[in-house]
Amino acid sequence: MPLTGLEIYKQLPKKNCGECGTPTCLAFAMNLASGKASLDSCPYVSDAAREALDAAAAPPIAKVVLGAGPTAVEMGDETELFRHDKRFYHETAIAIQVSDNLSSEELKAKVEAINGLNFDRVGQHYTIQAIAIRHDADDPAAFKAAVASVAAATQLNLVLMADDPDVLKEALAGVADRKPLLYAATGANYEAMTALAKENNCPLAVYGNGLEELAELVDKIVALGHKQLVLDPGARETSRAIADFTQIRRLAIKKRFRSFGYPIIALTTAANPLDEVLQAVNYVTKYASLVVLRTDAKEHLLPLLSWRQNLYTDPQVPIRVEEKLNEIGAVNENSPVYVTTNFSLTYYSVEGEIESTKIPSYLLSVDTDGLSVLTAYADGKFEAEKIAAVMKKVDLDNKVKRHRIIIPGAVAVLKGKLEDLTGWEVIVGPREASGIVAFARANLAS
């Protein structure tokens, strides 16, 4: 929890000098607590007090950056246990694992397939964020070659997975500027791993065999001066991993246990790709900031990415599209006009069905604060007056010759009033988007 004004006041010099712009230190403390002032405004605060206040004000889970440049991914910096309390902020990063045991041709083909993992769904663009290269070969040079090959073939972020710091060091030399995640520091190698991560300013995964060992290892690494950490509590069985992830998140959020105040990495282990995706869905749901999978099939990953997108939307703000007149196909002055709300799911469902009719059409989206048709109508946000006003706003009269507009069947009651307000012919369309194709064939086919 954030500090109160009185708790902050105890750390201040209590000089009441007024140089911060407020007459007393207590008033300044109250402003700090409410976010209206910065500690930098006080010239007399001690270094110890500043460190204590900065630590208290720090987010319960640190922000860790994977990668560099425009593709860099922010992990952590979360404040809630439950999405409905506020929201989750940084989407789980998805990484696809490749092995240095693959031949150069196999590796090239694998990376090419991973680069193609891009999806567009209901107006949202989905993609993965990283490729994880695992050192499985007996020859350390194979790992260096694999890392170099992957780095040259992709702009995705990198995760370098090797237990031997010397092997990692050789491979990292050519890609250090891309700030890959180094996996992983253990009780046996943490000093060398930490030195390598510090030297190259890279995030470091910390692997512990259980929560107690993990906490002790994190404290040792932080004492060595590196705080860009990602946690792996070691569990690979799904229910055990979920239990550990939940404990880490709960202790970080509720108890401010700093040893667990870092993002979590999860590795899937299921042999069957569908089971692997189910594992990943559970890990995304239960607090993993980075999930590493082996499957790279689009049909396996799309459900996972769709779930991630839904989980990380703001539950207090409906997903919506812009209020405007949208063109579907090569429209002309004879094209039919449909109208719907700007709720994203409704809009893209209608748009997809209109595209399936193969009839170039206009689709007018009306701003209903992101509510669906019936919900917006019940709330008074999708009424004849509102539709008429938007029609005038987009100058619809001059867009088409035949003044007729198709409204959703669920709000057929709007037909008469909308005709009176606009002078247009109002056609009552189907109640569901799935009926648009049959409706168009029956009513719009020339």
From Swiss-Prot:
Recorded superkingdom: Bacteria
Residue positions binding 5-methoxybenzimidazolylcob(I)amide: 340, 346, 370-373, 433
A biological-process GO annotation: carbon fixation
Classification via InterPro entries: 4Fe-4S_dom, Ac-CoA_synth_d_su_TIM-brl, ACDS_complex_subunit, AcylCoA_decarb/synth_gsu, Dihydropteroate_synth-like_sf
Coiled-coil zones: none
Function: Acts as a methyl group carrier in the anaerobic acetyl-CoA pathway (Wood-Ljungdahl pathway) of carbon monoxide and carbon dioxide fixation. Binds the corrinoid 5-methoxybenzimidazolylcobamide which is then methylated by the AcsE subunit.
Protein name stated in the entry: Corrinoid/iron-sulfur protein large subunit
Protein source organism: Moorella thermoacetica (Clostridium thermoaceticum)
Gene that this sequence comes from: acsC
